[in-house]
Structure formats: structure tokens, C-alpha cells
Regions:
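Short internal beta-strands
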Residues: 94, 120-131
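Metal-dependent catalytic neighborhoods of phosphoester/phosphodiester hydrolases
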Residues: 104-113, 135-136, 143
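Divalent metal-coordination and catalytic microenvironments
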Residues: 5, 54, 68, 80, ...
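Pre-active-site segment of Zn-dependent metallo-hydrolases
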Residues: 43-48, 56-92, 108, 115
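Metallo-beta-lactamase
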Residues: 90-101, 128-182
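Active-site environment of divalent metal-dependent phosphoester hydrolases
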Residues: 15, 74, 99-103, 130-133, ...
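Zn-dependent metallo-beta-lactamase
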Residues: 1-62, 167, 172-182
């Protein structure tokens, strides 16, 4: 049994970081262009946002869950291609919350993977407020999650307003209230 998490986007890349191994955990680094078989024009893309790909093994069963989708499809798809991650292997999609830097690459992923994703693939979101329009601190448009676009791509939308299980392996929490110190 085990869990592997690949970071596809996280605001940062450091091509000179070295792998780390400790008991029960191994951290591999990706980002440079000196990998065998990868042309020098190809490299890891860093940008604002978050995307992770979790692979869990339970007995002889393996499940793959993509958590968040970064800010742009260009970076998400580029990084997926860089490490050879096939969208057809995804068993579930999870969105942590409705900010553009977490869902921005989703529709591009769905468009690029049309006809390749598993039938009935589910997207777990925390609730209806994930679809709210948001504004930046300066009052600009921060985007909103496109429900019609998601449904048109054949994705099964799961409003996880209570804890849920994604792909039979991953627990998705319900909404976590935001509290400020003010």
C-alpha cells in the first residue's frame, strides 16, 4: 500500500533541487532539461496556482486523483506532458476551492483530453460557492468556475457538502469555514 503525490503546479520550480529520501518517504525533483530523451526546449513550467496528482495503492488496486488544476491549461498540460502523465488514467477530479489559481487549467485539460477521459469521471467540489464569481482585492474579475463547460465535457459534478470518497480511495472533506482574526 502507498501514496504518491506529484506536484504539477505550485508557484515554484527549482531545477537545482536534489532528490531527498527518508524512511517511508522519497521526494523526487523534476524541472531541468537534462533528462534523457527530453529535448532541451522542454522544461517544467512554474506559475501561480496549485495542481497535484495523487496515486494511491491499496492491495492490488491503484487509483489516480487529480487535485486542483493550476492557473492555466498551458502550464498544467505542459507539466503533465513533461512527466508523461496520461489524462486517461485519472479516476477522479477534486477541486479544493473556487479560486482561479486552482481551477484555471480545468477546462483546457478537459478540452485537450476529450474522448480520452474515463466515462462518468467525477469532479468533487466543496459546494455551490465554488461557482461564485470572485473579485480581486483591487476589484477586478477573478473568474468563476464554468459549470456548463464542465457538464458539457461529460464530467459528473459531485457537490461534496459532506465528507465523500473519491475513486474509492481518497477522502474529500466538506467545506472548512473561513475565520479571520479580525
Amino acid at each position: 500500500d502507498g501514496l504518491s503525490v506529484r506536484i504539477l503546479a505550485d508557484n515554484h520550480t527549482d531545477r537545482y533541487s536534489v532528490p531527498v529520501a527518508t524512511p517511508g518517504m522519497k521526494i523526487d525533483r523534476t524541472g531541468g532539461t537534462e533528462r534523457p530523451g527530453v529535448p532541451p526546449a522542454s522544461t517544467w513550467r512554474a506559475e501561480w496556482g496549485l495542481s497535484m496528482f495523487a496515486e494511491s495503492v491499496l492491495g492490488d488496486e491503484t487509483k489516480r486523483v487529480m487535485i486542483d488544476f493550476g492557473y492555466t491549461a498551458e502550464a498544467l498540460l505542459g507539466n503533465m506532458g513533461f512527466i508523461g502523465l496520461d489524462p486517461a488514467t485519472i479516476d477522479a477530479l477534486v477541486l479544493s476551492h473556487g479560486h482561479t489559481d486552482h481551477f484555471g487549467g480545468l477546462l483546457g485539460l478537459l478540452a485537450a483530453s476529450k474522448g480520452k477521459l474515463k466515462p462518468g469521471l467525477s469532479l468533487f467540489v466543496g459546494g455551490e460557492d465554488c461557482f461564485c464569481s470572485r473579485q480581486t482585492v483591487a476589484g477586478g474579475d477573478f473568474g468563476s468556475l464554468d459549470r456548463p463547460g464542465i457538464l458539457a465535457a461529460g464530467i459528473k459534478l459531485m457537490l461534496a457538502e459532506a465528507p465523500a470518497v473519491a475513486a474509492g480511495h481518497a477522502v474529500v472533506s466538506d467545506q472548512i469555514p473561513k475565520a479571520t482574526k479580525e
